[in-house]
């Protein structure tokens, strides 16, 4: 009986050690894949707008001046009322879904000056007797040849957005502006008189794919 119990304990410890080792290896591989930041070949040109994110184009919408823009993330409508005073005239809004295997570093869609950064913490808030959920998001407004608005959208619980830039900072097209740590979506807005090149379903790369021509 003693030998049997000793054997059981040995096997448990051995399997637990193997399981723990596999978990550690998996975590290391996940971290390497998720936090990778490869070099990008940024296209040259003053009259182009490039993708701020890796991922898939899930929607292309028109926003009229004075309207409250919104996007849809995982079937949920996310209103962006903070943009109402920022965008003037008619804008095109391209939404890009970032999957778990996409690079999660975001880049400037144009060259210009950062004129505004707006951070919305997100979380769960009481409203009209119910709990209202608001997604964490960070908004970077860049003025260059045109004005672009890049919205990084994360989840509703933990802080998951890192912003790499500051207001009044001058950026070159393709410069890194931030990172979203977990499953996420990025929206880029630009004047509607620009010519949109991408279409819904296209795969795009941050800092490389041209999404519109000014």
Describe these PLM feature segments.
Residues 1-214:
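Contiguous, well-folded functional domains in the mature portion of proteins
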């Amino acid at each position: 009986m003693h030998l049997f119990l000793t054997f059981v304990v040995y096997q448990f410890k051995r399997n637990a050690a193997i399981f723990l080792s596999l978990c550690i290896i998996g975590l290391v591989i996940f971290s390497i894949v998720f936090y990778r930041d490869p070099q990008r070949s940024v296209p040259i040109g003053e009259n182009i707008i490039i993708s701020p994110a890796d991922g898939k184009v899930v929607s292309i919408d028109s926003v009229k001046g004075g309207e409250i823009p919104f996007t849809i993330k995982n079937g949920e409508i996310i209103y962006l009322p903070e943009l109402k005073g920022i965008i003037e005239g008619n804008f095109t809004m391209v939404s890009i879904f970032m999957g778990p295997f996409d690079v999660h570093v975001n880049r400037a869609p144009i060259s210009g000056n950062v004129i505004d950064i707006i951070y919305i913490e997100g979380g769960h808030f009481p409203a009209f007797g119910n709990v209202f959920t608001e997604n964490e998001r960070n908004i970077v407004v860049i003025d260059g040849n045109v004005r672009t608005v890049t919205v990084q959208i994360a989840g509703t619980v933990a802080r998951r957005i890192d912003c790499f830039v500051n207001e009044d900072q001058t950026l070159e097209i393709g410069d890194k502006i931030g990172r979203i740590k977990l499953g996420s979506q990025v929206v880029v807005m630009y004047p509607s008189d620009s010519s949109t090149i991408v279409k819904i379903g296209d795969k795009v790369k941050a800092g490389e794919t041209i999404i519109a021509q000014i």
